[in-house]
């Protein structure tokens, strides 16, 4: 389910109409099929535009096994080389239900970060970095720890992407015990044209919600929006109540918050909780709308919901209805309506 514009699998049985008329964008690679089916069961149209491809380096089972070993025998030092890699590690541990013992094992350790992004990810996880390499180089980090002395110390080294930078070997050479953890590697978007189209469409109001399942994916998608100079337009859609940004957990939400969004974050960091939160938002009267004599009116990308009933509308019909809604019952000239089209 990494391909193009749409619509993973239409065979999912519909169990509610809470998302009828909603077009939801998934800029995700991991478990997108599962998420698509869950949203379609509530009547949503789903589009896929993966911002990244995950290239497994060591699988989640291996990462979790090594993390369990750290919980059982906590490290003296934790080396965090990248913000995205550390976030990915925390997300994997959270999904495995091990977050609390994992953080408890890391908290007493000396935590060192290779630059401000790594420090930010450490802080978002509720931990504190004891030292940060201002040059953002592994060489500075290595020099600092070797000068402090690491003989006999148990060191957890989080790697990401391009490998170890020689850290494991340098620490082992002076008598440290190294637990090496490579989270996963990110490859480029499988279809950059679809990714570019998705950020432009978001700025033009074509989506009701965008769901993020990883911090690296969120960073990459927002980076694409920034590069195409459409990020302000996407922020405007959210501010107007026409776009819901949602993230599976606070780590994933980090890049969205940094960019100025106010994402919906479920209480539990699970895909099922994310889907339920989105269904509750649109199906429970929490989406932007107005009260009318005929009941509550809410706009969707595919039409309007009036008193809980979905009414399909053309784009022109939606544009006119949107202008009238914003007028709040005030009179509108024909010219003003035409200018909105």
Roles of regions detected by a PLM:
Residues 310-341:
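Short amphipathic alpha-helical recognition elements used for nucleic-acid or partner binding
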């Amino acid at each position: 389910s990494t391909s193009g514009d749409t619509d993973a699998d239409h065979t999912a049985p519909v169990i509610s109409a809470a998302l009828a008329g909603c077009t939801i964008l998934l800029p995700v690679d991991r478990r997108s099929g599962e998420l698509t089916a869950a949203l379609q069961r509530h009547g949503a149209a789903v589009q896929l535009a993966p911002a990244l491809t995950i290239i497994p380096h060591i699988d989640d089972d291996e990462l979790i096994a090594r993390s369990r070993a750290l919980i059982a025998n906590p490290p003296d030092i934790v080396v965090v080389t990248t913000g995205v890699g550390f976030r990915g590690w925390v997300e994997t541990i959270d999904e495995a239900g091990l977050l609390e013992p994992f953080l408890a094992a890391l908290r007493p350790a000396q935590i060192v970060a290779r630059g401000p992004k790594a420090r930010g990810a450490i802080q978002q996880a509720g931990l504190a970095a004891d030292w940060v390499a201002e040059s953002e180089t592994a060489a500075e980090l290595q020099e600092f720890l070797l000068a402090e002395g690491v003989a006999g110390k148990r060191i957890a080294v989080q790697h990401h992407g391009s490998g170890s930078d020689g850290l494991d070997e340098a620490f082992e050479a002076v008598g440290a015990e190294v637990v090496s953890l490579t989270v996963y590697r990110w490859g480029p978007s499988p279809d950059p044209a679809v990714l570019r189209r998705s950020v432009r469409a978001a700025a033009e109001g074509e989506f009701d919600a965008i769901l993020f399942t990883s911090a690296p994916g969120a960073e990459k998608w927002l980076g694409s929006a920034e590069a195409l100079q459409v990020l302000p337009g996407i922020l405007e859609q959210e501010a107007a109540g026409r776009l819901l940004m949602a993230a599976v957990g606070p780590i994933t939400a980090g890049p969205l918050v940094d960019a100025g969004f106010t994402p919906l974050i479920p209480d539990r960091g699970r895909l099922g909780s994310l889907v339920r939160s989105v269904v509750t938002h649109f199906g429970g009267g929490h989406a932007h709308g107005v009260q009318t004599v005929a009941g509550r009116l809410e706009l969707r990308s595919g039409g309007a919901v009036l008193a809980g009933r979905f009414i399909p509308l053309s784009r022109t019909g939606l544009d006119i209805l949107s202008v009238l809604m914003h007028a709040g019952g005030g009179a509108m000239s024909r010219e003003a309506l035409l200018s909105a089209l």
